[in-house]
């Protein structure tokens, strides 16, 4: 019932998206679920994924309090807050962010982020300091009760775990004028079944290589494809490395020369371009107001949505 209410709330936001798009709102970075999706449920059937001897049912892979771990050798032992969580509200962190910390298109990759940064972001979500430009967007709204339910010890154990992980390159970036035609999925898009193509326009098209393995089976080895417009990578590099008039841009000064973070400043290299654009837009629109977001405001206020797209396209090509 709660999920259906959230989906209805998201549907109502479609009008907001249509209006906001007129003022350069990057709607492609904020996929909405217009109605509760019909998940492909195969009750009792043992599922398999490539490279794993583990067998799980769909019901097991979708259990928020017992994370599907197809590849235990890919990561160290998980603390309980990551692998199991605590009922009723503190979901297992790895349910959404995966045992390897790779996350998905709808949320953040946590692998290798500073532990103190992770802790602060969860606390900012709990207090409302970190919000989103679409405050009823389900991936964000579902995190609020989780962030409020988790204890300090649980949070710090999870943050230490994810911080210890080495981030993996999960993106396959393709630059061009055309991209797959899309269909709405749960929280993100995927290519239509007929393989049709359409002009990419001023968008980044990002989706999991294998929707079923990613969303239903929760296989953390599934990579993501990001189609970016022709010329966007070079334009993004120019903005990030040689601002060319936008003197407020000084990414390396805070995020490090290789953009993989510096101290408690997070890495921005090799991250989901959709995620990067959402964060830039959220900060610019005043939805994110944590201490680090405030430091970013002079930077993002110098950007338009095309700048954000180009920067995100370039960052996606970098090793994490």
Segments the model singles out, each with a brief description of its role:
Residues 95-102, 126-127, 163-166, 254-260, ...:
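Detector for the c-type heme attachment site
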Residues 104-110, 263-269:
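Short cysteine/histidine-rich zinc-coordinating motifs and their immediately flanking basic loops
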Residues 111-140, 171-173, 269-280, 285-294:
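Extended intrinsically disordered, low-complexity coil regions enriched in Ser, Thr, Gly, Ala
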Residues 1-10:
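Bacterial N-terminal signal peptides that target proteins for export
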Residues 22-91, 133-250, 286-320:
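Flexible coil segments in periplasmic/lumen-exposed cytochrome c-class electron-transfer proteins
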Residues 266, 274, 305-306:
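Copper-binding active sites and cupredoxin-like electron-transfer domains
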């Amino acid at each position: 019932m709660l999920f259906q209410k959230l989906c209805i709330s998201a549907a109502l936001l479609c009008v907001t998206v249509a209006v906001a798009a007129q003022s350069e709102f990057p709607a492609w970075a904020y996929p909405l679920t217009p109605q509760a999706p019909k998940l492909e449920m195969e009750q009792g059937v043992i599922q398999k994924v490539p490279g794993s001897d583990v067998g799980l049912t769909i019901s097991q892979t979708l259990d928020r309090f017992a994370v599907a771990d197809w590849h235990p050798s890919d990561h160290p032992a998980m603390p309980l807050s990551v692998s199991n969580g605590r009922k009723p509200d503190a979901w297992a962190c790895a349910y959404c962010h995966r045992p390897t910390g790779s996350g998905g298109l709808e949320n953040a990759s946590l692998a290798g982020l500073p532990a103190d940064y992770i802790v602060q972001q969860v606390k900012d979500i709990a207090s409302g300091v970190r919000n989103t430009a679409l405050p009823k967007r389900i991936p964000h709204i579902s995190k609020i009760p989780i962030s409020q339910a988790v204890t300090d010890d649980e949070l710090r154990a999870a943050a230490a775990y994810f911080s210890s992980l080495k981030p993996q390159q999960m993106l396959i970036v393709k630059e061009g004028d055309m991209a797959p035609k899309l269909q709405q999925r749960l929280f993100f898009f995927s290519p239509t079944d007929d393989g049709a193509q359409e002009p990419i326009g001023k968008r980044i098209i990002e989706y999991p290589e294998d929707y079923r393995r990613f969303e239903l089976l929760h296989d953390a080895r599934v990579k993501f494809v990001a189609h970016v417009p022709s010329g966007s990578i070079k334009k993004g590099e120019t903005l990030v490395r040689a601002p060319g008039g936008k003197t407020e841009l000084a990414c390396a000064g805070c995020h490090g020369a290789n953009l993989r973070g510096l101290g408690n400043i997070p890495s921005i290299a090799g991250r989901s371009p959709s995620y990067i654009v959402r964060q830039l837009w959220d900060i610019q629109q005043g939805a994110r107001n944590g201490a680090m977001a405030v430091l970013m405001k002079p930077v993002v206020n110098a950007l338009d949505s095309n700048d954000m797209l180009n920067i995100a396209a370039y960052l996606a090509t970098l090793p994490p």
